Amino acid sequence: MRTNPTTSSPVVSTLEEKNLGRIAQIIGPVLDVVFPPGKMPNIYNALVVKGRDTVGQQINVTCEVQQLLGNNRVRAVAMSATDGLMRGMEVIDTGAPLSVPVGGATLGRIFNVLGEPVDNLGPVDTRTTSPIHRSAPAFIQLDTKLSIFETGIKVVDLLAPYRRGGKIGLFGGAGVGKTVLIMELINNIAKAHGGVSVFGGVGERTREGNDLYMEMKESGVINEKNIAESKVALVYGQMNEPPGARMRVGLTALTMAEYFRDVNEQDVLLFIDNIFRFVQAGSEVSALLGRMPSAVGYQPTLSTEMGSLQERITSTKEGSITSIQAVYVPADDLTDPAPATTFAHLDATTVLSRVLAAKGIYPAVDPLDSTSTMLQPRIVGEEHYETAQRVKQTSQRYKELQDIIAILGLDELSEEDRLTVARARKIERFLSQPFFVAEVFTGSPGKYVGLAETIRGFQLILSGELDGLPEQAFYLVGNIDEATAKAMNLEVESKLKK
C-alpha cells in the first residue's frame, strides 16, 4: 500500500501524544533507546533527541529505528553527528517515518537528508510532506509500454537510447564532462518534456556539490532571480556525514521525484551520484548494527536494500522517473558485489571516455562501450537499429586500423579502408554536439537534435554522399544541414585566405 503525501508537519505536534524513551547506550552513530512497556516504536519510525550538552549547546538529533531488540529496547541510527549526547537523555518517538517537503517549492533549493533547506534562502514554502519509506508502485499502476526517452543528444539517442522510466549507469572519471552532461540532460528534459529533475548527492565531496550548484546557477538551470522557474531540486548527503544520512539521502531525493511523477503527472529525471556510496553507507550501518557481513564484507541485505530503492524508480500511468546513476567500480572490478548488484537493475550504460575528451570530442561518450537494452529493431525500428549498427561497425573498424595507421600511415591502407577511416572520423566528430549549458564557456549556441534528424545525418555520412566534405565541418554542430553549411563557410574562408 503506497502512502500518500500529507499536509502534516514532520515534527511532533502535540505534547500530550509524545511517546518518550531514554538513551541507554551510544556507539558512534548508533543509539540504543529504552521505551516504557507497550510503547515500542515501529521499524523506520523517526526518533528525535532534543536538549543541551554539557557546555549548554542546543542538541537536535533525528534518528531512525532499525532494530527492535527486546526488553523494551530499540536500536536506531542517527542522521547527524551524535556529539554531546549522553545516556539518560530523553528521546521522542514521532510515531511516523522521516517525512520531507515535496512539490514545486522544492525546485531551486538544496536539502539535507531530513528535508531541511541548507542554502540559507529561508524555509520552504510548502506544508505538503511525504514519508521517505514507501512501497514501489503496484503492477497494475505500471506502464509496461517500452518507449524511448529522447534526450536531444545525438550520441545517446542513436547508440545507447534511454528508456522512459528506466535506469542508466553513468561511468566516468574526473574531468571527462560528467557534470556538464548531467546539466544538459536536466536542461533538455525541462525544454522538450516540460519535466523537472532531482539531483541526489550520495556521499559526495562537499566541494563537488558546491561546484555543481554554482554551475547550475551560471547556466540558468537554477534561476536565482525567480527561484520558482528553476528546473531542479538538490538533495545532498556529503562524505563527512554519518552513514545513516548517506544511506537515506537517496530515498529523500527519490521521494521528491515521486511526488512530481504521481501528483503532478510529470516526467522526472533523477540523478544519483554515487550509487556505490549508497551501498557503502549501508555496509557501515550493517556493521554498526552487529549484522554478520556477507561477501567482500558487504551487508547481507545488499540486494534487498538496492531493490527497495531501484524498484521505486519506474514508469506509471501518470508519469515516469528516469534515473541516471553514477557508478563507481572499486579497483575496476566489475564482479565486486556493489556494482554487480547495480548492473542487474540498469537498462543502459553511458561510458565517458578520457581518450575522446582529450581529442575535444564533447560529450565524450564512448560509442562502442556504451550499451542499451532498448537498441532492438522491435523497439526503435529497423531504420534506427541498422543505422546504429553501421555506425558501430565503422567505428570498430577504425579502432582496429589505428595501430596500422600509427606505424605505417594512411597510405598503406587499401582504398576501402581509407574510405572507412574517413567516414569514421566524420562520424566521430558528428557525435560531438554544442550544449546549451556550455554556451557561457564556448560562445557557441546549444543544439537540441531530434532523433529523426540524428538518424538522417548518420545515414548521409554512411552512404558516402558527404565524402567530399572536410571532417572539421562535422565538429560541434547540431544536425547534418549545419555541417553542410559549415563546410561551405570553410571553403569560402580558405578561398579568401588564398
Curated annotation (Swiss-Prot):
Presence of the UniProt keyword Thylakoid in the record: yes
Molecular function as annotated in GO: ATP binding; ATP hydrolysis activity; proton-transporting ATP synthase activity, rotational mechanism
Subcellular location: Plastid, Chloroplast thylakoid membrane
Keyword ATP-binding among record annotations: yes
InterPro entries given in the database record: AAA+_ATPase, ATP-synt_VA_C, ATP_synth_F1_bsu, ATPase_a/bsu_AS, ATPase_alpha/beta_chains, ATPase_F1/V1/A1_a/bsu_N, ATPase_F1/V1/A1_a/bsu_N_sf, ATPase_F1/V1/A1_a/bsu_nucl-bd
SMART domains: AAA
SUPFAM superfamilies for the chain: C-terminal domain of alpha and beta subunits of F1 ATP synthase (SSF47917), N-terminal domain of alpha and beta subunits of F1 ATP synthase (SSF50615), P-loop containing nucleoside triphosphate hydrolases (SSF52540)
Cellular component GO terms held in the UniProt record: chloroplast thylakoid membrane; mitochondrion; proton-transporting ATP synthase complex
Gene3D superfamilies on file: 2.40.10.170, Bovine Mitochondrial F1-atpase, Atp Synthase Beta Chain, Chain D, domain 3, P-loop containing nucleotide triphosphate hydrolases
Reactions catalysed according to its record: ATP + H2O + 4 H(+)(in) = ADP + phosphate + 5 H(+)(out)
EC number in record: 7.1.2.2
Bilayer topology: Peripheral membrane protein
Coiled coil: none
CDD domains: ATP-synt_F1_beta_C, ATP-synt_F1_beta_N, F1-ATPase_beta_CD
Intrachain S-S bonds: none
PROSITE patterns noted in UniProt: ATPASE_ALPHA_BETA
Highest taxon of the lineage: Eukaryota
Entry keywords, A to Z: ATP synthesis, ATP-binding, CF(1), Chloroplast, Hydrogen ion transport, Ion transport, Membrane, Nucleotide-binding, Plastid, Thylakoid, Translocase, Transport
A Gene Ontology biological process term: proton motive force-driven mitochondrial ATP synthesis
Role, per record: Produces ATP from ADP in the presence of a proton gradient across the membrane. The catalytic sites are hosted primarily by the beta subunits.
Family (UniProt): Belongs to the ATPase alpha/beta chains family.
Subunit relationships: F-type ATPases have 2 components, CF(1) - the catalytic core - and CF(0) - the membrane proton channel. CF(1) has five subunits: alpha(3), beta(3), gamma(1), delta(1), epsilon(1). CF(0) has four main subunits: a(1), b(1), b'(1) and c(9-12).
Protein name (record): ATP synthase subunit beta, chloroplastic
Origin species: Acrocomia aculeata (Macaw palm)
Gene: atpB
